[in-house]
Amino acid sequence: MKSLVKAKKEPGIWMQDVPVPEYGVNDVLIKIKRTAICGTDIHIYSWDEWAQATIPVPMTVGHEFYGEIVEVGKEVQGLKVGQRVSGEGHITCGFCRNCRAGKRHLCRNTLGVGVNRPGCFAEYLALPATNVIALPDNITEEQAAILDPFGNAAHCALAFDVVGEDVLITGAGPIGIMAAAIVRHIGARHVVITDVNDHRLELARQMGVSRAVNVKYQKLSDVANELGMLEGFDVGLEMSGNPMALNDMMKAMNHGGHVALLGIPPQETPIDWNQVIFKGLVIKGIYGREMFETWYKMIAMLQSGLNISPVITHNFPVDEYQHAFQIMASGQSGKVILNW
């Protein structure tokens, strides 16, 4: 089958023919229809320090997908051939304390599809049935292809109560933009998003934010004053991994504020702990999606009218994957979809 493979320990992705994956008695085989390129895939494509330390070569990459079930393992229940599906890309062990307690997103033995095991940038994907999400008919193929990153956004945006609250989002990548749409949809008052990328800030404006702020030219304190905010932000969602953005958020938070951290800053990032301690900030790390409450909530939000379509900016046939990766890496895009 056709597959996009990290075939060499150097920058790039290569299209190769690989065997159709075998599937076990508790797995399903999925015919891939659409995939989306993630920031993780760009790290692998660029072959940065994280990728070099993490990715076995060769490896079929990718973990964001929509497809249809074509084969079902003999022990699988509740799924059938022909169903429209997406899937959870974190494969958990099922035996650790957190898995047994129903907190699979905290499994210490998690394996990533397209990172530690063959991914979805291929004509077929084998996936444990417990990770497969059957889709309602009113979820489109494009929406289904980006449910994984939408789930990151939902996990972060739903970490704290945002109804009537003022929310600051640092980082206007696709996940940050979708988080902005979520908190607006569920009742936040002011939603401010920051970045230095004007293209992505414009996408955020299309998603209904109160202010999309280029911090190269405008101060957060000035924006807060314009909005009539006298006490700072109630909830912060840090999506960028940028040390300056992280510390700007801490300064902008109200006393007793809540901060969810999804972006991964460099290990040596200094933090002004005085802001955290004397303001009594509550900080929560966010990784992946809650299994499977986040999936339920995000599909329900789409069904209730949440529109995330503006974040999808490019569609390419899979044979144009090199151009698609270059566009995604440029930062001048939202989500980029490959059609198989």
Swiss-Prot record:
Homotetramer. It is found in: Cytoplasm. It comes from Legionella pneumophila (strain Corby). Its EC number is 1.1.1.103. Its cofactor is Zn(2+). Binds 2 Zn(2+) ions per subunit. One of its GO terms (biological process) is L-threonine catabolic process to glycine. It comes from the Bacteria. Pathway: Amino-acid degradation; L-threonine degradation via oxydo-reductase pathway; glycine from L-threonine: step 1/2. This is L-threonine 3-dehydrogenase. The keyword Membrane does not apply.
